Amino acid sequence: MGKRILVQRRGRGGSQFRSPSWKRDGPVRYPPLNVTVGRGYVVEILHEPGLNAPVARIRLENGVEFLNFAAEGLYVGQEIEVGDLAAPKTGNIVILGRVPEGTMVFNVEKRAGDGGKFARAGGTYAVVVGQKPEENKTIIRLPSGKVVEVDSRGRATVGIVAGGGRIEKPFLKAGKKYHRAKAKAWKYPTVRGKAMSPYAHPHGGGSHPKGGTPVPKTAPPGQKVGFYGSRCTGRGCVRARAQQKL
């Protein structure tokens, strides 16, 4: 008798697959728009195990505290300006419509008040390309190179997210990768379906290696592994499609 495959167990959401939320310091987002803005300072810089960049705890003059990604060069005790009158200096939280073209920013809001959506990974930044004051839009270039328009009333932090270069350091040991996966609730290591027994996976079993065949989209959960709903796979498929376009 077959068993539920791993992807079904993960979808059920057992405790071993859930992210350890009790280890998190809190959501990284800007304070609500109704909060009086002005000046603040960096209380501490934290290591957030669920993220790939250090996080700064910022306290405003009115006592409101929030978490934001730390910019490169940010230090504890540094004064931070927040709001309309903030200067475009590293670490300050500014309004996008008042930022000069060519400024590097991160944790950019797509809509005013959403807390930040773009350029949040370690070592990344977006660049302000232009302004459309008549439409209340700001044009920015994302780390991927894509150019998008966002709300000019939205907020962003000037600078580059700290933690750049983290992917340049190799893991060297499987144990290091294990601990990283555990901190982020990733499944590690990943076992190939071909290496399993037939009761554990549709690709399992057999005394010699064999590949799975494409599964129809109408197949029930548990059968959908590998390619499903595909008409053609592999390099030959790419060439065939290219010839069809000619």
Curated annotation (Swiss-Prot):
GO biological process: cytoplasmic translation
UniProt KW NAD keyword: no
Pfam families: Ribosomal_L2, Ribosomal_L2_C
Disulfide bridge map: none
Listed GO MF terms: rRNA binding; structural constituent of ribosome
Keywords, alphabetical: Ribonucleoprotein, Ribosomal protein, RNA-binding, rRNA-binding
Listed InterPro entries: NA-bd_OB-fold (IPR012340), Rib_uL2_dom2 (IPR014722), Ribosomal_uL2 (IPR002171), Ribosomal_uL2_arc_euk (IPR023672), Ribosomal_uL2_C (IPR022669), Ribosomal_uL2_dom3 (IPR014726), Ribosomal_uL2_RNA-bd_dom (IPR022666), Translation_prot_SH3-like_sf (IPR008991)
Start and end residues of each stretch annotated as Disordered: 197-226
GO CC, any one term: cytosolic large ribosomal subunit
PANTHER family with a match to the protein in the record: LARGE RIBOSOMAL SUBUNIT PROTEIN UL2, RIBOSOMAL PROTEIN L2
Family: Belongs to the universal ribosomal protein uL2 family.
HAMAP family: Ribosomal_uL2_A
Function: One of the primary rRNA binding proteins. Required for association of the 30S and 50S subunits to form the 70S ribosome, for tRNA binding and peptide bond formation. It has been suggested to have peptidyltransferase activity; this is somewhat controversial. Makes several contacts with the 16S rRNA in the 70S ribosome.
Binding partners and assembly: Part of the 50S ribosomal subunit. Forms a bridge to the 30S subunit in the 70S ribosome.
Protein's recorded name: Large ribosomal subunit protein uL2
Gene name as annotated: rpl2
